[in-house]
Amino acid sequence: MLDFVDMVSMARYLFAPNTLPLTNLLMNSHRKALETMFSFQGIQVDADVNQFRLIAGMGELNGVPVQQLVIDAVSINLAVVGDYADLNNSYEVLRKFLTEIDSKRRMENPKLYTTTYQTQSSVKLTIPYERLVAPELMNFLRSKTDVLRPNDSSVAEIHLSNLSFQVKYTPNAEVYSLVPKVLTIEPRAGTDPKESTYYVLTPTASDTHRLIVEEFEKAMGGVK
């Protein structure tokens, strides 16, 4: 079984207009209550073209680190250190809080258009980095190391560094749009190439993230 470390789960919850009680949340007493509940190091409010955003970073809820929380008029962006269960638990606590501070209790049964997820992690695989690109390309690049040297006293080496793909979406509904997401499977920066430690970012929740990586390793001829 693969050992996923440094996992971060992120989600964007997109709501119909006038669902989120942002005006209520911007009240000092409610902001302070939220800051206390999540042990945030600080909360700030930004205004851009008459649109307010509440931004909080680095907190904790029930032992789960919360990396970021951003709330605007129609969406909640939440990132926690952990898996989908940790993310969902944090969201539910937030949703109940937003329900309680709103006399209309709109977040009790919110009109949620869609939720998009992202998960990142580091994981050791039995796949050499070079296997991610065509052998012809690696052979060509390595044949040019002499001309890539800045001077005769240096030795140039070429290693794979970054590898990302863009995932585009076309929603079935026309009331909202989705921005493209990034799918990344690349060498983890600062690690020994011999260890084959990868940084992986997928536009999915953590369960699918794990499944994609496991199937990727099998497809690339790793551990059977």
Segments predicted by a language model, with ranges:
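Short, intrinsically disordered low-complexity segments
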Residues: F40-A85
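Non-transmembrane, amphipathic alpha-helical segments
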Residues: G82, D86, L201-T204
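Short, surface-exposed beta-strand/loop "edge" segments at domain boundaries and coil↔beta transitions
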Residues: P17-L22, L61-V66, Y84-Y91, R131
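Surface-exposed beta-loop interaction hotspot
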Residues: D83-V147
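Short amphipathic beta-strand starts and helix->beta connectors
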Residues: L61-V66, I101-M107, L183
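Noncatalytic linker/hinge segments flanking ATPase motor cores
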Residues: V49-G57, T119-K124, L163-T170
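Glycine-rich, often proline-containing surface loops adjacent to acidic residues and nearby aromatics
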Residues: D3-L14, Q67-Y84, Y113-S122, T191-K194
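C-terminal interaction module
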Residues: M1-V45, T126-K224
